[in-house]
Regions:
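Short glycine/acidic-enriched loop and turn motifs that connect beta-strands
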Residues: 60-64, 117, 128-130, 178-180
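Surface loop/turn motifs at the tips and blade-to-blade linkers of beta-strand repeat domains
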Residues: 35-38, 85-88, 99-102, 151-156
Length: 181
């Protein structure tokens, strides 16, 4: 039984053309893709509530390196990369013991959800200056703006990777590896 299952899985995956990978090494469109350049290490993408913008986390680096990244969006109408302005207010959604240490980020995984209270929450896995999950309220008009609403510190020696939000504000998070390794 297991052998038949194994053969079925091998046959299934071998039917895909994995060797037909066409690398795009410049910023020129081809017959399949329209290419947009100018992003710094785009790590994760999320469609905005209006479905007219794509939120992009531009990864920087992990500690002990200190290359910071950005949160930006790609406007699907104008086809331009745009910065996201962030306003900082009191920690209302995060852990009371988590404090904003630096306004710069090294964002990784992101998730967006409309909370039970009707507000949009954007959660961002952040690697610098320390491992945190940063919580923002997202306001979308013609542009995207964020209001910092709090953070949650990672357990010691853990590197978060991605996050999945629930409507009540709780979440699931993945850990890439233990930093002691």
């Amino acid at each position: 039984m297991l052998y038949e299952l194994f053969l079925t899985i091998v046959f299934f995956f071998s039917s895909f053309g994995f060797n037909e990978f066409n690398e795009i090494s410049n910023c020129n469109d081809d017959e399949v893709f329209e290419i947009f350049c100018g992003f710094q290490n785009p790590e994760d993408l999320y469609l905005s509530p209006s479905k007219t913008k794509i939120i992009v986390s531009e990864f920087g680096s992990l500690a002990p390196n200190t290359k910071f990244g950005n949160l930006v969006y790609f406007d699907l109408k104008t086809k331009k990369r745009e910065p996201i302005s962030i306003n900082y207010e009191a920690n209302q959604w995060g852990d009371d013991t988590c404090n904003l240490e630096d306004k710069r980020l090294s964002p990784h995984g992101i998730d967006l959800i409309e909370r039970n209270d009707g507000k949009y929450m954007l959660a961002v896995v952040n690697h610098l200056p320390r491992e945190t999950i940063e919580l923002f309220e997202l306001i979308e008009t013609d542009v995207i703006e964020l209001i910092w609403r709090g953070c949650v510190d990672a357990p010691q020696n853990k590197y978060f990777n991605d996050i999945a939000l629930k409507k009540d504000g709780s979440y699931y998070v993945t850990s890439m590896f233990d930093s002691n390794i």
